[in-house]
From Swiss-Prot:
GO terms for cellular component: basolateral plasma membrane; cell cortex; cytoskeleton; nucleus; plasma membrane. Transmembrane segments: none annotated. Gene3D superfamilies: 1.20.80.10, Phosphatidylinositol 3-kinase Catalytic Subunit, Chain A, domain 1, Pleckstrin-homology domain (PH domain)/Phosphotyrosine-binding domain (PTB). Binds with a high affinity to glycophorin and with lower affinity to band III protein. Associates with the nuclear mitotic apparatus. Binds calmodulin, CPAP and DLG1. Also found to associate with contractile apparatus and tight junctions. Interacts with NUMA1; this interaction is negatively regulated by CDK1 during metaphase and promotes for anaphase-specific localization of NUMA1 in symmetrically dividing cells. Interacts with ATP2B1; regulates small intestinal calcium absorption through regulation of membrane expression of ATP2B1. Pfam families: 4_1_CTD (PF05902), FA (PF08736), FERM_C (PF09380), FERM_M (PF00373), FERM_N (PF09379), SAB (PF04382). GO terms for biological process: actomyosin structure organization; cell division; cortical actin cytoskeleton organization; positive regulation of protein localization to cell cortex; regulation of calcium ion transport; regulation of intestinal absorption. This is Protein 4.1. The gene is EPB41.
Amino acid sequence: MTTEKSLVAEAENSQHQQQKEEGEGVTNSGQQETQLEELSQEAAEGDNHCEQKLKTSNGDTPTHEDLTKNKERTSENRGLSRLFSSFLKRPKSQVSEEEGKDVESAKEKCEGGQKEIEFGTSLDEEIILKAPIAAPEPELKTDPSLDLHSLSSAETQPAQEEHREDPDFETKEGGGLEECSKIEVKEESPESKAERELKASQKSIRRHRNMHCKVSLLDDTVYECVVEKHAKGQDLLKRVCEHLNLLEEDYFGLAIWDNGASKTWLDSAKEIKKQVRGVPWNFTFNVKFYPPDPAQLTEDITRYYLCLQLRQDIVSGRLPCSFATLALLGSYTIQSELGDYDPELHGAEYVSDFKLAPNQTKELEEKVMELHKSYRSMTPAQADLEFLENAKKLSMYGVDLHKAKDLEGVDIILGVCSSGLLVYKDKLRINRFPWPKVLKISYKRSSFFIKIRPGEQEQYESTIGFKLPSYRAAKKLWKVCVEHHTFFRLTSTDTLPKSKFLALGSKFRYSGRTQAQTRQASALIDRPAPHFERTASKRASRSLDGAAAVDSDRSPRPTSAPAIAQSQDAEGTVPGAPVKKTVVSKAQKETVKDEEKKEEGPPDQAEPEPTEVWKDLDKSQEEIKKHHASISELKKNFMESVPEPRPSEWDKRLSTHSPFRTLNINGQLPTGEGPPLVKTQTVTISDTANSVKSEIPTKDVPIVHTETKTITYEAAQTDDSNGDLDPGVLLTAQTITSETTSSTTTTQITKTVKGGISETRIEKRIVITGDADIDHDQVLVQAIKEAKEQHPDMSVTKVVVHQETEISEE
């Protein structure tokens, strides 16, 4: 109301007074305008200052809305300055009063609570009378010390005193301090909780970091241990071998069985948890690489666990054997576990306590007992060695089988062994791919491929494919092939070069030691032979220190363990009787050896004489004959599924009228039972010797006069004598005979192994009978041509032409 009255009074004043005061009004107008602007800014800053204190006491932070409101407040300040321009012409008294009101309003805004709200309402009423002004909004928090520089000391001190005297402000500040202290306490409590949670998580990790493993060993015992969760396969294998006291651990591995039928080898270079499905970690300890020659193993304990693996293979049916082989291997098993036969200790059915065959019969047990009783002073290590020497000759020894199909969809079985890849159909081997002939092995999806090296007559490589049940089966077969090839064929393992770019293909490689490296490491073993206990009989081992050194006067093999499995003699006689024996050597020389030659030969190749071996046994002659009869039966049936060679008519004639036999005994014919001697004439032409043998006449007997000529064509051989002394180990023998009205053709295929090298030799005999004259040269050329056409990858080493003609009486 005072402002309106002052305006009316000013209108009633005279004009001359107004003109006098115009100069002063103009000069004072600038000062009043600046003072009003400062007051408006101070009021706004006071509001902001109070809001900032409240926000800082509550622990709030400036937001985006505060930033925008700060800009709006500056615009509002400019609007206030324009509105106050209408009051410039008023007298100083009125202006000073309004300035005091404005200062008081600015001071009252700093006070919180109800005073601020009441002042806001009164201020709004005055603003409505003057001009519409927007209500002030909170701004961004700023430092109050920086905002006070625009105010004088006289203006700031009363405000500070009022703040100090205001109890509400103190309580608010105190509440803010209390909240800050509470916040600090809350900040400490989350840290303690975090530490507690971290410790609890560490405890839980420590609890679940170790995994429990169960490993089924070869002696039907279970080894349990705890390994780290991130442990690799080689860590667990090393712990198992340490438990078993095995140093030659590279031949063994840990297997994971899927559905109890198919096994997967645990990769020693990868973590176990990435290879095992599920929490229970159950494995089996098995032989992974079957050594081709177990005698080269250094320690007896290694051979013992190899024997245990082979026993499991026989019982499960993975290693098929004939009846005679089962009896022989079973007798060595009993000897290894129980020792020599003792009628006081062993009962009548002590063999039935052992599982020796998948279908064990009473007849088999009796045969095993019979052979076991014949052994004397044979140590467990010797029995294990004899067991391995006979088991390694079996066709399925160390073969890892995988089911597959050929390209035509026929079910086959692929076998991986130390020598190569084998193909079986209906339990018969139909093909073989040795490692030297395999260039590359690969798999794609569920298909498995092998690339074969071209032969002599071929120009390009050939690729053979097989279909497997699944992708995992194809990958597993590929891994097994890679591991076997690396272990048996390479001297050291291959390491993949680190490529900077993305490499295609699998990075899997065999990470263990090869067989060559294992043998080098085994040669450095200098510990004494470990004493171990056989689980079946709880019998301690009497080691032979590797069974390498044996007395020369005593053969390490008993009479029932032949050094080399041979088929029965062509004549069908008992080995103990004096016979004339035909031996086909490795170089395919046909020689006839009688008793005198056999006695002069080395003891390794001659059969052990029964009188010398059984001299100290006090046995009767009937038992000796019975024992040797069993030996002959074992020899006869050892090579299972192999037809016995049928002697031809030419074999019988050669055994009695052979010129080589006559030359071997220096021209003297031995006397003995047999048909009457006939007159013979021999002409031998040899390309290697380039000499003609002299005519050897015999006694004249008035029966039949015949003339026999033998012409030998033989390729030059450097190690001919050594080949005769060491014929090698016979793997398979097959005889095929075809007859016509005038000729008989006999083909004999033999496979032998000497020094780790397998050789296949084919001997073809053609006997032509007839009264007409025969062009022998033409027959010879035709026979050689047919042999080369039938077997292009083989070479002819020897051709023998045997001609026998009757001579008319003079």
